[in-house]
Amino acid sequence: MKILVIGVGMYVTGRGTNTFGTIFPSIIEFQRINKIKKFEVIFAGRNFSNIQKSKKKVLKALKISKIDLSKINFKVSFYPNKKNKKQTYKDILKNEKNLSCAIVAVPDHLHYQVINECLDHDLHTLAVKPFTIKTKDARKLIEKKNKKKIFGLVEFHKRFDKHNLLLKNAYDSKRLGAPLSFIVEYSQKKIVPEELFKTWAYKTNILQYLGVHYVDLVYFVTRATPVRVLAIGQKNWLKKKGINTYDSIQCIIEWKTKSNIKFTQTLSVNWIDPNNSTAMSTQKIKFLGTKGNFESDQKARGIKIVSDDTHVEEPNPDFNMAFQEGNRTEWRGYGIQAITQFLSGVRKIKNKNFINSNYYNKSKEDEFFKYFNFSSTSFEEAAISTAVLEAANKSLKNNSNWQKIK
């Protein structure tokens, strides 16, 4: 199995943080369980300097995982490198043989371009959120992957969080009644736009980068259709720092269920939390129904750590946590699961020579869930949140007017 990972930043390797990211630890855990005889991960970064920093992270993660590389063929390679300082992911796509799949973790504004090129080379592709920024681009990608009979997924890992699965179970059981509203508060530390994403933060906004998770989640829980959107944003602190993007955005989405019941979702998102906040992300969701409500504080998960060396910490043990098992490190959580289920699905497909099968003899949904987890997000489903983002961005540019979703 040969995996191409395009992008080598914080989420892939933990570069710029004291962690090892989420994507590569997920790949480690996938191989630890499956012990595939020939297993290779190719990392494609933007420049030689970044790839060198990420390479150190990758090699250290492998070392502390204590995977016996003499028994498991686990090869990693990095581009650009000393011999090929100008080589990019485009060269790898063109020249590398027998790639199994691609994982795309690049800045938001590059998603369409990179995903499109992966599909051009017939690769099952997993992309981090958001899927795309424009609906027309989402439609093009969906059409292409269907024509080529390959799979495309977007890594909306909040669908795998047991907090949110409990919300879905409560909603589906109808014990909370008909939906009236969802209220979401979601924020991250200033270090994210100011340092970690400084080179491209001005090309996105906090709703696209972060809030989209909970737009997708409301669709996942209710299967409702977004009808119209209103968004208001504030530019202050980041603009003074030379980063021309919104500090905070408030967004109202009107949804309609299959039973023609309308409800609203209100999101308040920002990425200017103090850097000494007790967690990287502060996140809460509340559902109000005609028979009851559901509240989930997804930052305060019952753990606080205080030491002389650090401020108070409230870690999230459910997302992606490194645990010591004897002398080795293992990573567990719904963030890990969201990626390993994609790799498991690709392996099933490859073992069954899926591309040459009668793809359209069954419904696309049945075929999708034969290989992937029920919580997985197809390109088709991810296009729902893209439509909301596009309308929200139009609202921001037009005096925060309501924008209908087409």
Model-predicted segments: where are they?
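N-terminal glycine-/serine-/threonine-rich beta1-alpha1-beta2 phosphate-ribose binding loop
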Residues: 1-121
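Predominantly a Rossmann-like dinucleotide-binding segment in NAD(P)-dependent oxidoreductases
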Residues: 9, 153, 158-244, 251, ...
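Short, well-ordered amphipathic alpha-helices
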Residues: 22-32, 55-60, 165-171, 251-254, ...
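Active-site loop of classical SDR/Rossmann-like NAD(P)-dependent oxidoreductases
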Residues: 49-54, 329-340, 357-360, 380-384
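Beta-strand-loop-alpha-helix segment that lines the small-molecule cofactor/substrate pocket
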Residues: 101, 107-159
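Short, well-ordered coil/turn segments that N-cap beta-strands
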Residues: 123, 150-151, 178-180, 261-265
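Contiguous beta-strand/loop segments that form the cofactor/metal-binding neighborhood of enzyme cores
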Residues: 209-310, 325-352, 364-369, 389-393, ...
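Glycine- and charged-residue-rich phosphate/anionic-cofactor binding loop of Rossmann-like
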Residues: 352-384, 404
